[in-house]
Amino acid sequence: DKGFGFITPDDGSKDVFVHFSAIQNDGYKSLDEGQKVSFTIESGAK
């Protein structure tokens, strides 16, 4: 709903910020709580 959120890595490391524009998916770019995803961390402006 907000356009951003956080991913909790399985390895217990710190949560990772994710913006909806980074989601590579056809159609509506959203993630559901608890959904399993794969991701690559990229540095960007804060």
Curated annotation (Swiss-Prot):
Residues covered by the CSD domain: 1-46
Regulation: induction: In response to low temperature.
SUPFAM superfamilies, A to Z: Nucleic acid-binding proteins
Keywords linked to the UniProt accession: Activator, Cytoplasm, DNA-binding, Stress response, Transcription, Transcription regulation
Keyword Transcription: yes
GO cellular component: cytosol
Entry keyword Transcription: yes
Coiled coil: none
Gene3D superfamilies tied to this protein: Nucleic acid-binding proteins
CDD domains the record matches: CSP_CDS (cd04458)
Localization in the cell: Cytoplasm
GO MF annotation list: DNA binding
Subunit structure: Homodimer.
PANTHER family to which the protein is assigned, alphabetical: COLD SHOCK DOMAIN PROTEIN 2, COLD SHOCK DOMAIN-CONTAINING PROTEIN 4
Name of the protein this chain belongs to: Major cold shock protein
Taxonomic source organism: Citrobacter freundii
Taxonomic lineage from the root: Bacteria, Pseudomonadati, Pseudomonadota, Gammaproteobacteria, Enterobacterales
